[in-house]
């Protein structure tokens, strides 16, 4: 009788090993969902965003500049250049900072997608490292970025002609395959992180002064990334996906937190700068020839070799 009474008072204990195997799993998933809803808004990650912007400017934007500034005697053409070492550091530091951003997200994000994206990012950036290293070394031999591979004076007369095919393959790895495997996972990770940057409290949807100041160099760097990387389609798709997500979440009375606003405003500034850049060079006949088609977004280094370095 006492045992029966105890079983009636604690029905869960009576189930013991006979309880449904999925019950605890469903309960855990339900608890995890509740925890995501109840979690507070993350503060602005000033340290991570500052390091992220700084290393982008120094290790990515500054990479080709360092290759031109440092004496050639220090880094012979048959050895890695200072820009190559910058690129190696970028390939290590950037994935690390992206993972730290994901760790600080107040929401549970798809880890498997993040890990596969990071692996693909590192592989694509490493492919680009090799191709970009050779292409920038060709500048010292008279290679002109505003011309196609076959139209370049130092390449078009190579013999046998199959050598030209090899240089075109190198260009393909650098500008197409490397960029695709580098930038697609990069923007995918940023978008996944952005999807977790929403708060139910409108008062928390604001940016501190430091974030506003940091958004300007961040947006300017993404302008360089979009134009030099020739990824305008990928960028505009990501930006409009972010905009659509903001409008969708607004219906649920969810608003961007400071980190989401920082990323969104940085991309908005980038879009404005790209539009101004294209408008400025819209009627350039030489660049128009290199970038035919509907989408015309000249590369900054093509502009440099055409209008700056070619001056007497």
From Swiss-Prot:
Coiled coil: none annotated. Residues 1-10 have a biased composition (Basic residues). Its main location: endoplasmic reticulum. It is found in: Endoplasmic reticulum membrane; Endoplasmic reticulum. The chain crosses the membrane at residues 57-77, 82-102, 112-132, 178-198, 205-225, 226-246, 261-281. It comes from the Eukaryota. It holds the Pfam family CLN6. InterPro entries: CLN6 (IPR029255). It is a multi-pass membrane protein. Residues 1-22 are annotated as: Disordered. The keyword Transferase does not apply. Keywords: Endoplasmic reticulum, Membrane, Transmembrane, Transmembrane helix. GO terms for cellular component: early endosome; endoplasmic reticulum; endoplasmic reticulum lumen; endoplasmic reticulum membrane; membrane raft; nucleolus. The keyword Membrane applies. GO terms for biological process: cholesterol metabolic process; ganglioside metabolic process; glycosaminoglycan metabolic process; locomotion involved in locomotory behavior; lysosomal lumen acidification; macromolecule catabolic process; positive regulation of proteolysis; visual perception. One of its GO terms (molecular function) is lysophosphatidic acid binding. Interacts with CRMP2. Interacts with CLN5. Interacts with CLN5. Interacts with CLN3. This is Ceroid-lipofuscinosis neuronal protein 6 homolog. It comes from Canis lupus familiaris. The gene is CLN6.
């Amino acid at each position: 009788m006492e045992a029966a009474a105890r079983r009636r008072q604690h029905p869960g204990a009576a189930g013991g090993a006979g309880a449904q195997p999925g019950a605890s799993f469903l309960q855990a998933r339900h608890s995890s969902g509740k925890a995501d809803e109840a979690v507070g808004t993350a503060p602005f990650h000033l340290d991570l965003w500052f390091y992220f912007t700084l290393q982008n400017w120094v290790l990515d934007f500054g990479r080709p500049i360092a290759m031109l500034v440092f004496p050639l005697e220090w880094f012979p053409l048959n050895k890695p250049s200072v820009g190559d070492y910058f690129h190696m550091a970028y390939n290590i530091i950037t994935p690390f900072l992206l993972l730290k951003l994901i760790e600080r997200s107040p929401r549970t994000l798809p880890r498997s997608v993040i890990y596969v994206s990071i692996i693909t990012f590192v592989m694509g950036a490493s492919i680009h490292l090799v191709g970009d290293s050779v292409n920038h070394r060709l500048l010292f031999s008279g290679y002109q970025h505003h011309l196609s591979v076959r139209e370049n004076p130092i390449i078009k007369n190579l013999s046998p002609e199959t050598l030209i095919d090899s240089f075109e393959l190198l260009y393909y790895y650098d500008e197409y395959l490397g960029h695709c495997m580098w930038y697609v996972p990069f923007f995918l990770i940023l978008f996944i992180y952005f999807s977790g940057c929403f708060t139910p409290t409108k008062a928390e949807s604001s940016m501190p002064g430091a974030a506003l100041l940091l958004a300007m160099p961040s947006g300017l760097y993404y302008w360089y990334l979009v134009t030099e990387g020739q990824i305008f389609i990928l960028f505009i798709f990501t930006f409009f996906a972010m905009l659509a997500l903001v409008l969708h979440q607004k219906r649920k009375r969810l608003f961007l937190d400071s980190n989401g606003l920082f990323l969104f405003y940085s991309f908005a500034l980038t879009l404005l700068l790209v539009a101004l850049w294209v408008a400025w060079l819209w009627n350039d006949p030489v660049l128009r020839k290199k970038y035919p088609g509907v989408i015309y977004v000249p590369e900054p280094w093509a502009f440099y070799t055409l209008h700056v370095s070619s001056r007497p």
